[in-house]
Amino acid sequence: MSFTLAIVGRPNVGKSTLFNRLVGKRLALVDDQPGVTRDLREGDARLIDLRFTVIDTAGLEEVTDDSLQGRMRRLTERAVEMADVCLFLIDGRVGVTPSDEVFADILRKKNAHVILGVNKAEGRAGDAGAIEAWSLGLGEPVRLSAEHGEGMDDLYHILRPIAEGFAERAAADAPVVDVDVSEEEADLEADPDAHKPTVKRPLQIAVIGRPNAGKSTLINKIIGEDRLLTGPEAGITRDAISVRSEWQGTPIRIFDTAGMRKKARISDKLEKLSVADGLRAVRFAEVVVVLLDVEIPFEQQDLRIADFAETEGRAVVVAVNKWDLEGEKQEKLAELKEMFDRLLPQLRGAPLVTVSAKTGRGLDRLHAAILKAHDIWNRRITTARLNSWLGAMVEAHPPPAPGGRRIKLRYMTQVKTRPPGFVVMCSHPDEMPDSYRRYLVNGLRDHFDMPGTPIRLTMRGQGDKNPFKERKFRTPSRLRKHLGKKG
């Protein structure tokens, strides 16, 4: 019973509150200030046994120019055309306004299924607005309180027959496919490519950066349509907007985030909410694209953003935007690489890609870099290979001997992926200097081809149980002396 429902209406009638109610999470920013929502935000909605896609839209306003409000209105009209059903919300406490009448007329012409909802209609305060709503000519209004969850049953009974109609149509149009889905799912764990993106498990990408770096423009170019609001004004995006799409054959879910300024500059309450929303999007993501402006790259805030993504353990790709504006490309590229290596040593080897979100140049390279970063982030190395490598590393450069006691490295294993995490069993783990840890981490990157991805390395003492104690490994002779084995 899958269909798409767009929630539309004037600013501040409760669209985002209802969106959050339907998706069961606080995904959209909510505030009593009009115009909080500026982009189209999609979510997986659930209403009793109905499952559908819901779109939260910017408020409809009576403007048609190229102002910010005008572009917001055009995005909303696009959502109306995309949706199977429109839920037109008015404010029950305010009643029907002249703008409501104009937009009701527009919706009648643009969409076959329009449901009229009177929000904030709890108690007697909403009675007059609910009665007045009949004058819009959209049929019987459904009384709702998005904030308190009232009227959801009534909305369900209106949506159910519409959903059944779409389900019957989809079943009639669906091709017959001779595939045992259960067998495919059962083989997923045995598949070495199990981490590859699929429609059910798309690659999660977050695009982050300072305000006006071109994040929304880049995403619009990637997905091939104007889904996100763009313009010269810094800070247009306020939410972390998520869009599902396919990019050069790769199923993706891509997050656009609010621009992240220095904390001292974040004074507006909405902007604080937006930045926190962007940080949450990083935690949802698998690959984070840090987008820089070629004219002012590697500002202090860029470095903080990249460091945050690495600290969160996400695969990182650095993209330098507005490359079409750069005249001396070779000299600038050499300068960017030098700055990257010097200012972000924790991301040594991470891909640096030049792009133009405006023209689309460089998106092929960006796509390839994201897929490679995701593959490395999911990489698993066998214990035998790790211990063979560890023996060679110790032989080339033995651990220090603090207080005259040599630190002995017993064995090593990988304990997790996403990002790769390793444990080394050793004597005196607390005395292992950071310089030797970096030596091992850099060696892992170089030997196993894992540039740029965060690597977690933990030292554990001999008191911890060795899960490989009873197992026999065929190890090189030079490693046996370090593992305490007898030939």
Curated annotation (Swiss-Prot):
- The positions annotated for binding GTP 2 are 209-216, 256-260, 321-324
What InterPro entries does the record tag this protein with? G_ENGA, GTP-bd, GTPase_Der, KH_dom-like, KH_dom-like_a/b, P-loop_NTPase, Small_GTP-bd
Q: Which residues form the KH-like domain?
A: 379-463
GO biological process terms, semicolon-separated: ribosome biogenesis
- Please provide, alphabetically and separated by semicolons, the GO molecular function terms listed in this UniProt record: GTP binding
Q: One Pfam family of this protein, by short name?
A: MMR_HSR1
Q: Where does GTP 1 bind?
A: 9-16, 56-60, 119-122
- Composition-biased stretches, type Basic residues, lie in 471-487
Domain annotation EngA-type G: ranges: 3-167, 203-378
The record, for PROSITE patterns, names: G_ENGA (PS51712)
| HAMAP family, sorted | GTPase_Der
The record describes its quaternary structure and partners as: Associates with the 50S ribosomal subunit.
Function field? GTPase that plays an essential role in the late steps of ribosome biogenesis.
Q: What is this protein called?
A: GTPase Der
Q: What is the lineage of its organism?
A: Bacteria, Pseudomonadati, Pseudomonadota, Alphaproteobacteria, Rhodobacterales
Q: Encoded by which gene?
A: der
